[in-house]
Amino acid sequence: RNLDGFAQSVKAVMKEAGRGALRGIHGPVSRLIHAQADYALAIETALGAAAQNLVCDRDEDAKRAIRFLKETHGGRVTFLPLSNIRGTRLREQPSGEAGFVGIAADLVTYEPQYADIAESLLGRTVIAEDMDDATAIARKYGYKFRVVTLDGQVVNAGGSLTGGSSIKGAGLLSRRAEIEKLQAEAKTLTAKAKEATDTY
């Protein structure tokens, strides 16, 4: 499968896993967690570098892959063993606040086995409409959790702000959301073409 946009180290592990030399590797987080186009930039921002973390079954699988990377000078990867990772949820419930879109973990889809991964990476991040809403929510809750806007600006836990411009559609999730959207459009157009041909 195409791994454009991924780090060389991630590609190296996936290639070894693909040929059966490394077992228990499920793939990068950004391939296992799906976001619809409207939320893709916010979720990408919330994930940050974790989008390229590799999910595996157990510690042993991660250790084997790390040994491979070390021996081949293949770079570094963060592994998320399903046996270890436990999801955490936000205790606060800012759902009634102006501009609240949702908890990031609730705005993505994934297979049930990846629930703890999604919760651990996104369960304590709020998605808000814009920066004004994000700062208001963060301030009201004492900057206890991170708030990310739909256009990828961030109010970090603790109160620091991160933002600026980002290239729309450049991230791994945005790219996949766009591909899925185009594939659906292509399917619709193919069906319409067939229908037109049949009635002609």
Per-range role (PLM):
Residues 2-195:
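Hinge-like oligomerization/junction regions that interrupt long coiled-coil arms in large cytoskeletal
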